Amino acid sequence: MTKKQQIQEVLNNHPELRGKLYERGFVFTNADVNEKIYPFYGLWQTRKIGAYNLLVSEQQRYYVVENSDKIFVLIGHAYNPFKMQCDENDILHSLAEKEFASDAFWSDINELTGVFTVIILIGERAFIFGDASCMQTTFYNEKGNIVCVSSHANLIGDILNEERDE
């Protein structure tokens, strides 16, 4: 029996533990994901963003701002102590006003602190930024045409049906 099957068996026998699996987690992927079954069990928030699916655990927060051809997503909590910005939507709007990858953009994103991941979609391309201290872990994998970004490496394995190397 694989570790994944062992976990599924425990969660089938103790459904009250399902909300603890990948607590505060997120997944951002263009894969088809059934959020009703393991590992989500219908407990996660889901949202279609461009060609991607965003799944966020019930303990986590996320924010989305659209600006012309760009979509800005912030998962977690961010704060800009230099501009005294603590509202994540305001922070995303401020980033969206800047030309992507300009000096002003880099200045703003480098001023952020907190526990977060920022995802910026421009067309079909996704740009991923983690908080400076990596308090919010961010893992990714590409398998064929499938892109998967997540807070948990094992969650990517679950979605892509990959077994973890020992």
Ranges and model annotations:
Residues 1-166:
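Cysteine-centered catalytic environments shared across enzyme families
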